[in-house]
Amino acid sequence: GIRPDFVDFSTKTIYELKPFNPKAMQQGWKQLYKYQSLFQQKYGGTWNIILDTY
């Protein structure tokens, strides 16, 4: 399923939160691109994606 960490519908931005390490960050971007594609198909427009690390 798809479970982005946070979605801001007012700015069309999808956020994913991942630990600061290369493997997790790579996985985060992969998820974000998938979410972006799905959101653009479902809701239209251009969606921004942001990977936040901790």
Predicted regions and their residues:
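Catalytic toxin/effector domains delivered as secreted proteins or via bacterial secretion systems
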Residues: G1-Y54
